[in-house]
Amino acid sequence: MTGLLAAGLLAPFFFEATPEVRTSYVSLGKLMEDRPMQVTYARFGYDTETFGRFGIRNWDVSSLTGRRSDAHNHAFYHTEVGPTWQYDLDLADDWALKSDLTRSWTFYRRFNSAYAASNKTYNWWQLDQSLANPYLVPFYRIRKCFRGNDYTYFMAGVRRRFGLPWSLYTTPSVFVYGGSSRNLRRTLGPRPDGEPWTAGVSAITFRLEAGWSLNENLSAFMFVEQYDIVGQGHRHANARSSYRCAHNDWTLGGIGLRLKF
């Protein structure tokens, strides 16, 4: 009842937020930080029902530990903000093609990272799609970055949610990261032979999430992930990288809340 009242107060507007604490931070397929980070996602908008949901999204990342002087002189890492459009195309009972189109700007300030632009603002388009169904859900994300960080990034995988007693659930998933030659250079560093990277997959992640849904508006979750660079050449280059978080294999986890109104 409380959830229905909260949703009714906002309708036809909506608000979503996911505050998290992560032991490490993977950004666009690259292990950017191997220390604890705070990540917050938020979205506010208007649900037209017929033509989808229009809104504004925000993504903030901050450090929970002291900064290393080679990378930061403040805790703030970066923020993203921009308009979004979401639309669900019903295909059959319990089947739907879910789309999420985003136009965003990423703001970095006083950030120094090997093989990546820093201390600037760049913009990008991103499309997320998934085929919701009762069985195995395939999903993908593709992002095209502009203004100094001109590269294409993608993520693709599958997941399955299992309901458990007492409003508990678990969701295993597996997905790969990859992109254009420039994105692989950003992820792995330069090729040892000096040639451009061939576009493709650079890493894979195995994820297991478990959570508890109090109601339709609030759930708590925890997760663990195994992140691995794939390909002998990729692993060799990443192992030689001077970047302080260039681990070929890394286990990370986190906890968080999901709020929807």
Residues covered by each model-derived region:
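Detector for outer-membrane/organellar transmembrane beta-barrel domains
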Residues: 118-204, 209
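Outer-membrane pore/translocation modules
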Residues: 58-157, 236, 240-245, 251
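Transmembrane beta-strands of outer-membrane beta-barrel pores
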Residues: 21-27, 48, 58-66, 89, ...
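Repeated loop/turn-to-beta-strand initiation elements of outer-membrane beta-barrel proteins
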Residues: 15, 49-56, 92-99, 133-140, ...
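Predominantly the C-terminal beta-signal and adjacent terminal strand-loop region
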Residues: 204-261
